[in-house]
Amino acid sequence: MKRIVHFTILILLLNLCFLFSPRPKPETNFCGEYIPINAYAGFIRNCDANEFLESAISPSALVRENYVRQSRPLYVIAASGIGYVIYYTSNLFTSEDLIGVEKSMYVAYVCLNFIILLFALILFEKIILILTKGEIPYVVILLLSVFIASNFMSKAFFWTAHQQMLAFLMPLLSIYISIHVIKGKSDMWLYVLFFLMGVGMLMYGSFLILFGVFILQRCYAYYEERKITLQSVVFLAISCLIFFMPTVLWIWFLKYIGIEYYSHEVVRYHQLVWMTEALSISAGTFVSAMYVNVIEFFKTIDKLYLFIGLLTITMFVRKIKTGIVFEWNRNSKLILLNLVCFGCFFIVLGYYANRLTFTLMPILLCLSVANSGQMLRNKKNQVALLITVSIWHAVNVLSYGPFS
């Protein structure tokens, strides 16, 4: 409980600082609106907030024809539930409409952002303790947590109605389950896990990556144990059916009430389906499109340079001290598997932005810790980390933008 309080204070303090960041200039075009709190502070209401709020106020909007949030209904429903609790609680002892439904929903989304970020930091701590076998000072965990709680994404999306904070939770949840939860579990237990992930797909698309990670992990286990049999093939087939079942049921329900399922990501941005579209023309078209998309992806990794640098430093120091560049153990291999799966997914996605690619940041951070050995116990290294984190947060707060 004490650590939850510490993480809560950390998240709120760091993100309160962003309220005092430079406000957008009149000539700056961005997807959203600046909401001033007073002469010194304010926040950005992202343009996507309009649909998030509309559907939370009236979830029936989710079953409208071609509705933007239709493919991910659960996040909206969660916000709606929290929002109406806030609304009715705030008006419990008065006949006046103190806060209003829309503001209640907005507060609900910010609460969700906080809850998601809090869970991400809790998982991050658990992962770090596993990777270091508990031999790491608590203050170092708090310092490393700053990278997750304070960055350009939390600056742009923490104070708005959005689901972008899930980009921090997804990779950490995947790593934690990979290295700690899934090992030795029965097939029935895994079926339940895959079904829950399938339900998660109705909240955020990256649950597809988690499913891919665990299927590959299970396939490798079959290979190691020389158990590639009909039973293992049946398990994989049933797992796929169970995972996609919630989405199929949602699509079936929409068709039952006369609504054609709509995925904004597919229709507007051609995410993933660009591959079949290109292949339907020719193999050359596919290769050309893949080349262009890979280039576009690597244009968005600039926000990861610091974390690539941290990993490189741990590899360099380890090489000097032990003669080995990388710590090849079960945990580091599983983190690398996550990095490859998440990285490949975002390479072939077909839509590219810094905020999507930054999903790799927590994985790179965990990989750096896994490879650091005793480095993080060194006092000089801890001071260097403190200075790095302080500069990182200061730059994020004082820099101009991003606003969407």
Cite the ranges covered by each PLM segment.
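Transmembrane-helix signature of polytopic, membrane-embedded enzymes
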Residues: 90-104, 119-150
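Multi-pass, polyprenyl lipid-linked donor-dependent membrane glycosyltransferases
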Residues: 112-116, 143-173, 178, 203, ...
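Hydrophobic, aromatic-rich transmembrane alpha-helices
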Residues: 121-122, 219-225, 295-329, 339-343, ...
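Specific aromatic-rich, kink-prone transmembrane helix
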Residues: 123, 166-183, 189, 193-196, ...
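Transmembrane alpha-helix segments characteristic
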Residues: 142-148, 192, 234-241, 324-348, ...
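Perimembrane helix-loop-helix junctions
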Residues: 178-184, 195, 209-243, 324-326
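Membrane-interface alpha helices of multi-pass inner-membrane proteins
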Residues: 189-205, 211-213, 241, 343
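Membrane-lumen/periplasm interface segments of specific transmembrane helices
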Residues: 216, 223, 232-319
